[in-house]
């Protein structure tokens, strides 16, 4: 039995541990992807050679893994799975060409980076455009990264507030038929945004900002008649905004205003799907300076790798 060896003597013990993963989870993912055996012995990565092993791709994957460790000081089995999938599609060069710049820092000091090529393109688009549309299925990170971008803009004092909004339609439910005041009605629908805010700012800070209206949460209908200045405005679940609502929202933009519109066009709850303002906007607003339209793919799903396979199977029958 022969082995392919990669010298890691220039790497620290901690870096090699990160490469191996918690309880060797990264090595196990490499074993699964390459149908081989990866192990670490005497500061060397050893790979069992077999007839199907593509040694060049193994080298590329190991190099890409350490590239993430060098910049982000972390690596998990989901990263490894994604890197391997890119290698098999001959797209690793695209991944390495994208300088994965941190988007924001969490309350614990951890840096948030884009994890896929699509996410890196989205982050770059948010930095360089006034209006960004991000479409993609659940789990592609579009909403999370939009919030991270908004928080970073607020922390760096480039804007004065964050506005979070979304349509009030959800699987046939109407705010008018739900109990409680407006905040109680809207809050459950914005839970993913709250979770992201809490991770990046901490619960106490989020509550303080909401109280002072530094962070504003409101249904889309409440944007009518306003001019939004010095703010990052996130419209989530935008696939359920009508064409008229989308036009109304986009024309609220004032000075120093950035808008990020996120949605999943496979999850339209409107009676007529053709009434989706997100679908119309992505069609008619393409190729306008200052507006970027990003379509995230199933390969950008960053949840459990099984989620991507589930999404692909459902897509075949829908």
State what each model feature region is:
Residues 1-18:
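Short glycine-/aliphatic-rich beta-strand segments at the starts of folded cytosolic domains
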Residues 8-10, 40-42, 49, 166, ...:
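Flexible glycine-/small-residue-rich
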Residues 15-34:
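Short amphipathic alpha-helix segments
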Residues 26, 57-61, 246:
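Hydrophobic side chains in well-ordered alpha-helices
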Residues 35-38, 293-294:
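A short linear hydrophobic-aromatic micro-motif
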Residues 39-99:
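Interdomain "pre-motor" coupling segment immediately N-terminal to P-loop NTPase/helicase cores
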Residues 104, 108-235, 239-318:
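Conserved helicase motor core of SF1/SF2 NTP-dependent helicases
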